[in-house]
């Protein structure tokens, strides 16, 4: 039976997270998609995402991470798509190892591999969402998970001197950043660098002050606690785990409100916001 998993990531600007008291699980240090080559097989993985390192030590990836205080040596892990196919595993490993050398990672500095599917199974459409979520969990725990299914490693991967596959969990402590990639599937590759949420806190402290940072922490922790309570109440049947939104936040009032026209206007207006009624108004 065919099935798909999925997931949702709430992505906001830092000032919005501060204003709303949103918990921050990670900071997007760099994100890009790439064509990975013309292949006879639609899901065949290529090396297109290696272009993330275009320019080497002078690449946009290196410069963007530097703005957050992260160097190539600070990237502790890579969460790989790892489909255990003859094509994907060697290609993805070669890509990250080549990239590490290109952007100036110190020889001998290990780059630990997280094979997310060995932990959660293959979500297919939601696979990289699982990978990014796994990186945010690493920021919290400081523990790199092992690949319990690692019975043998493709001999081709021996060439990749930075890459390390763990057979047991490894506590590494504070992690500054990690990479996540998804290769192939429509000749498109996705590449993201996720940075520890400490980068957000440092930015708030520098731009808004310690008082603003402490206020944000209090509000964010309250949101986390409320979310955990709601989850547990839902698991015990005391609250709904899902409540549908009425008509996608558009409504028909039988008079001058045309949901179709209001939706078009909302999509074209950069200042469009939900009204206090919970709907987009005309």
Model-inferred region functions:
Residues 1-3, 20, 70-71, 105, ...:
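Solvent-exposed alpha-helices and their adjacent loops that cap or buttress functional pockets
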Residues 1-70, 76-77, 195-262:
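Condensing-enzyme catalytic core mediating Claisen C-C bond formation in acyl metabolism
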Residues 1, 31-48, 80-90, 107-161:
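Acyl-CoA/ACP chain-elongation machinery
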Residues 138-186, 190-191, 200, 206:
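Internal helix-turn-beta structural module
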